[in-house]
A protein has these predicted regions:
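Structural motif corresponding to the intra-repeat A-B loop/turn of tetratricopeptide repeats
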Residues: 15, 44, 92-93, 136, ...
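Terminal, low-structured helical/coil segments at or just beyond the last alpha-helical repeat
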Residues: 201-243
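"A position-specific structural signal for the A-helix of alpha-solenoid helical repeats
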Residues: 7, 36, 77, 84, ...
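TPR/TPR-like (Sel1-like) alpha-helical repeat modules
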Residues: 58-59, 107-108, 181-198, 227
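Flexible helix-coil transition and linker loops at the boundaries of alpha-helical arrays
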Residues: 19-28, 59-78, 92, 108-120, ...
């Protein structure tokens, strides 16, 4: 994209309802600026402009050892860009193969990154793949992939986004088939791998105590909309006091 197009995008993001300071996003030669602008445009529903910017990042190879104390790592920038490109391709063109390809790249990259992820759940990339398969009528394939993920993650107990999202998808599958009893059981199992605070424990207790299976499932769905705690613990900030 040319300088005029880039500056128009920067101006739109910097002057939006939730403005981002120009100094943080104006350098086109820093691909992380393009990442921020492109994703902000998508959030602002400027889909075509977002795709125009995000497409410039497809060939970028992120530094997999980059792990800043503040802000997103290069790996996270790339993963989030791929995620949003997949969403755009799916929503605008209904191109299943392209959308799944971008999500698979995002999944592989997030899985390979060895440092904490601040911005999203790594398992969300896998879940989005399953959701697209469901939308195109390949729900049985998605179910098989979710079950295979559970097999792959056997023994990885504790907080585990891959197991959580696999169980969540299977719970939704059973709900769609009219079996809320099984759906609620699967959702309860999913939350064994979800980061939960004391407030979350109370909410889950209420969900488990709901009178009917349908009410239990509905309550678990509500709990799934709340991020009670970060998915991954971050290292403590290093604060210099000798300046």
């Amino acid at each position: 994209m040319n300088e005029q197009e880039w500056q128009a995008c920067v101006n739109h993001v910097a002057g939006g309802e939730y403005p981002v300071p120009r100094g943080m996003i104006s350098n086109y030669n820093d691909w992380r600026c393009r990442s921020t602008v492109g994703r902000a445009l998508y959030w602002m529903d400027e889909v075509e402009a977002a795709m125009h910017v995000l497409a410039t990042i497809l060939d970028v190879e992120p530094d997999m050892e980059d792990a800043p104390e503040m802000g997103l790592s290069e790996a996270e920038h790339k993963v989030l860009c791929l995620r949003d490109i997949a969403e755009i391709v799916w929503k605008l063109a209904r191109n299943e193969d392209a959308a799944l390809n971008y999500l698979d790249q995002a999944y592989a990259l997030s899985r390979a990154y060895k440092h904490p992820f601040r911005s999203a759940s790594r398992g969300d990339m896998f879940y989005r793949r399953l959701a697209i398969l469901r939308e195109v009528g390949k729900e049985e394939q998605a179910v098989q992939e979710a079950e295979k993920m559970l097999e792959l993650e056997v023994g990885n107990d504790g907080i585990n986004p891959y197991r959580y999202f696999a169980y969540k998808f299977l719970a939704e599958h059973e709900h769609n088939n009219g079996d809320d009893e099984k759906a609620a059981q699967l959702f309860a199992e999913a939350f064994r791998y979800y980061p939960v605070s004391e407030a979350g424990e109370r909410d889950l207790g209420k969900a488990a105590a709901a009178e009917t299976a349908a009410d239990r499932y509905k309550a678990y769905v509500f709990c799934s909309t709340i991020q009670y705690k970060p998915w991954e613990e971050l290292p403590p900030a290093i604060i210099r006091r000798d300046l």
